[in-house]
């Protein structure tokens, strides 16, 4: 894994906006091979107020705009001339009234020094007749406030999404930084669990550690699910007492400069796993290790997802939750989706569920319906590997009532596992030609976790 000093050295440079613009043009050329002229036009997120209030809504930059600018300012624009290879950023001019409350904004010269662009102009410079652009304008229709005489609204968004699927060195460094901050927060939560009385206390520990280490934003709403709440995949109430619960499933990650981390660990609240919890944990850890070992450029993600199910079935047969069938038979009947209903992982980048994965949510096969990445893995992709086993009564009950599945499930044995709730283990990896680099350094071996918990 790259050292902290190397990551910081990379991030001391500029976000590579011009290279990203070239990446997008390269994808546009796949669709428009004769393209020699044209302008990419993107708008940043607008500043907004809450309804009937003068309080600003928390700002989140548009990811398409950020990818081509590295600029986190509201009410801005950019153009990229394909013919001239010129990237121009337009930022709001100084508003004397707002300086009173918010201080001086970034000047044009400061922005030119900060961002990887060729020119910085005030946004008033874009208040031009649309006929001033004689070239074809590539825009994202839903994120554009103006109409141009010649415009293409179909090609830009998919071109950016395809480009974003492959991360460069700078983007990987941002994700590594987010992971390292999240690792500090996860380990602080392990240390705090035995003295905590409520899920929200652990969420507070996690958030505090992220903010203290330079990541004030979370990549997504964290999951701090104790006991049976861990069987709800996106449980976000985070307000239940911990007393009497076996385990805590902690799925949370910091965002660093608009890039996400996404890490899950499951651990015993008391400092010791029960027999049933340890059995399930060991199965899930084996699932993850085997899936990690299979991950490399060219490997088909669908096949690795099937591998996760096969290992899960083997483990559940061993502990007796599943019975009366071979691994292949139970797999072909899709009974394992009762215990692993989600996909193995998803692309990670500026969005937690990042673009470019080519999912098919209309797939009639329940094993693949929620798989957010389909097809072969390319080198340079960052993806999560997050197998899990869950004991959710609402999900499993229909399987128990369907003879197709019920014959494979031992209800008496299953009853011993409801309180385990759910176990998920999730790391973020960079796909390489020969395998992968794990960007996540959070304890997951049982002995390592227990050292943090028990001091």
Swiss-Prot record:
Its cofactor is Mn(2+). SMART domains: AMP_N. CDD domains: Prolidase. Binds 2 manganese ions per subunit. One of its GO terms (molecular function) is manganese ion binding. One of its GO terms (biological process) is proteolysis. Catalyzes the removal of a penultimate prolyl residue from the N-termini of peptides. This is Probable Xaa-Pro aminopeptidase GSTUM_00008071001.
